[in-house]
Amino acid sequence: QGQQCGMLWGAALAVGREAYNRSNDVAEAQVMAILATEELTRSFEDHTRTIQCREITGVRMNNLFGLLKFMVESMIAGFDNHRCFILAENWTPDAVKIGQEFAQETTKGEAPAYNCASEMARRLGATEREAVMVAGFAGGLGLRGKGCGALAVAIWMIALQWIRSHPGEHPPMFRYPAVSKLLSAFRKKTGGALACEKICGKKFHSPGQHAEFISQGGCNDILTAIKQNIDYKSGLN
């Protein structure tokens, strides 16, 4: 859908995993993951001015023409010279530094750890480790108000379930019926909106503010709708 860059998803999951490994306190680890992802997103925007895939690549990858255009451009320029790979090379040192710095900090007492992403993961049967890993998706990726964190978690869980059910196999590229079905139901629920800021009608400025919103029932209808419409049986193919 082009809402977010996959590099940021990967980085958010990585700092979430590191937070879980570093802290014996799940609440502290979740806050650490959210704050680290917020900083990762700021750093990423310093390099690109946007976190949206379609704005970085200049193509819409949810259709065949967009995919072909991206692949042809990559082959002509050479993958080492493509904007995405150049971005990865330039941004990775900053991302690693941010991850290392946050891993050494303590966030005890920083704020309540309750968040939409971890709550969605738990409702879908995730382990505590997985729930912490995805915490950075909260509030539209590090509280930035972008693509819905709960939806991101559900898509990740679909992929995770497929991998576990197909050990040693490579997932299909670009065509995911279960994800398409979920996206369709999600858009119907939100009136077409995918961004957290539009769905919630506000932007969160701290983990505590987000936690208060979620604990008071904010987005509960969204989480419920996602769980009702997720289809593991369809998988990715």
Put a short name on every predicted segment:
Residues D25-A27:
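Flexible coil/linker segments and helix-coil junctions enriched in charged and small residues
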Residues Q1-S23, A111-E169:
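Active-site segments that bind and position negatively charged phosphate/pyrophosphate groups
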Residues A11-V15, A29-L124, A154-I158, P172-N237:
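Amphipathic alpha-helical interface segments
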